[in-house]
Amino acid sequence: MSEKLQKVLARAGHGSRREIESIIEAGRVSVDGKIATLGDRVEVTPGLKIRIDGHLISVKESAEQICRVLAYYKPEGELCTRNDPEGRPTVFDRLPKLRGARWIAVGRLDVNTCGLLLFTTDGELANRLMHPSREVEREYAVRVFGQVDESKLRDLSRGVQLEDGPAAFKTIKFSGGEGINQWYNVTLTEGRNREVRRLWEAVGVQVSRLIRVRYGDIPLPKGLPRGGWTELDFAQTNYLRGLVELPPETSSKVAVEKDRRRMKANQIRRAVKRHSQIAGGRRSGGRNNNG
């Protein structure tokens, strides 16, 4: 059965559907020697040859793909980009290496925001989770600086006008603090750029700390260090797939034995420590080079 080219490539982990549509439009993809155009359909067969930038890539039938999802604790200061020309740290630096696929970020967090960021090998899953029409909840813990009264909270719940259209928090709940430094937990069902910060700024309140603590029903895992990752289990992965009307997985690569889990936790801690040392040396070297 034929499928849209971008869907096949997204499912195989070569990018989100939007990313792949862009590279197809740029003429960077060929199918059996012919430059592909947006809207082309392909049937995945053993003889199918798809190239991106001239490089032959691997694609499999849907039934052969195993969808994997990571929960990553993004620290402040990391960029949500695959490569940075200035050599700054990115969210992809610490992720486990893959063969024949790559990690795709489910949305973005700005450089000054920390917390839960999901990654998957399934571009179609990433695309559906990000799409506003799916209305997947994102929850944030927010520390704000400024006077917050009932009128401002009412405006944030009912909606305010931003430069890219109206926006509102689905829920907003006070969670602690005193005076002009207070914490709130807020939820949104879309992921516009800096939306949480811009909503508070629209009522004259500044955000001094922002942490994403939940995506759908997937929470930021307890005990996960900043810069650490953990792979979602079978049930969690299928929960996300069901949330966006994708068929469930029937197999998983997640180890279930306790000793394997302990080994993974130790690997995560070592990777976080090693990456921090490398990043620190890189920053130190940068300062020396700049005098």
UniProtKB/Swiss-Prot annotation:
Entry GO MF terms: 23S rRNA pseudouridine(2605) synthase activity; RNA binding
Entry EC number(s): 5.4.99.22
Record's signal peptide: none
InterPro entries, A to Z: PsdUridine_synth_cat_dom_sf, PsdUridine_synth_RsuA/RluA, PsdUridine_synth_RsuA/RluB/E/F, PsdUridine_synth_RsuA/RluB_CS, RsuA_PseudoU_synthase, S4_RNA-bd, S4_RNA-bd_sf
Domain S4 RNA-binding: 3-63
Record region (Disordered): 272-291
Keyword terms: Isomerase, RNA-binding, rRNA processing
SMART domains, alphabetized: S4
Active site: 110
Reactions the enzyme catalyzes: uridine(2605) in 23S rRNA = pseudouridine(2605) in 23S rRNA
One of the GO BP terms on file: enzyme-directed rRNA pseudouridine synthesis
Disulfide bonds: none
Function: Responsible for synthesis of pseudouridine from uracil-2605 in 23S ribosomal RNA.
Family: Belongs to the pseudouridine synthase RsuA family.
Protein name: Ribosomal large subunit pseudouridine synthase B
Organism of this sequence: Salmonella typhi
Gene of this entry: rluB
